[in-house]
A protein has these predicted regions:
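A short hydrophobic beta-strand segment most commonly corresponding to one strand
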Residues: 73-76, 165-182
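Catalytic core of non-heme Fe(II) oxygenases with the double-stranded beta-helix
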Residues: 31-138, 184
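Residues that flank catalytic or metal-binding motifs in active/ligand-binding sites
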Residues: 18, 71, 84, 168-170
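Hydrophobic alpha-helical segments and helix pairs
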Residues: 1-25
């Protein structure tokens, strides 16, 4: 498996959990979007967040001897992109502890932007490397390629740019937890 080679560890689809799944934005094949629908694709398609889906399966992870919940694997295989591309916003300088991750993920995006710009939070060393003027990094996706990261990286699906009526964004998404020396992937 290519993922195993890339990661350097065995990768197993965990049959007891949902298999990696699809994010599909845009119209069905042969259908076009109107201006309002195109406008929606040009807006943030998801919240600013860290991936904590593994928390829904805490009882599942208990069956393994060695489990590392601090280093969650997240991956996206790009299948189809809008005409003008697509990608992922990344706030790689936001190094949150577990309590901050738990709080941050359940806030409204407006509150998250305030958190990301909260000078007091960063000045008290709760997060390293903060620059309040810095925009998030943009990781551009390419059709047929996979992007992955390990850890609680703050990120968001980047909205489409100059959306066209037949644009679609289709990706295969998944997550993984290292259990007994193998990545167990799920959705």
């Amino acid at each position: 498996m290519k993922m195993s080679k890339e990661l350097g560890d065995l990768v197993i689809c965990d049959d007891d959990l949902a298999l990696p799944g699809f994010h599909i934005f845009g119209p069905k094949q042969g259908v076009t979007m109107n201006k309002t629908e195109c406008y929606y694709l040009e807006q943030p398609l998801a919240s600013i967040h860290t991936d904590i889906q593994y928390k829904e399966h805490l009882s599942h992870w208990k069956q393994f001897k060695e489990v590392d919940l601090s280093q969650v694997l997240s991956f996206t295989l790009t299948i189809k992109l809008p005409t003008h591309g697509g990608g992922l916003y990344i706030w790689d300088w936001a190094d949150f502890d577990q309590e901050m991750i738990d709080t941050f993920n359940f806030q409204h995006n407006d509150e998250k932007v305030d958190v990301l710009k909260n000078k007091y939070l960063w000045d008290n060393d709760s997060v390293n490397g903060y620059n309040p003027q810095e925009e998030p990094l943009y990781e551009e996706y390419m059709e047929g390629n996979m992007v992955y990261f390990i850890g609680h990286l703050v990120h968001q699906i980047a909205p489409a740019k100059k959306c066209l009526p037949n644009d679609r964004r289709i990706t295969l998404q998944g997550h993984g937890i290292m259990c007994d020396g193998a990545w167990r992937v799920y959705f």
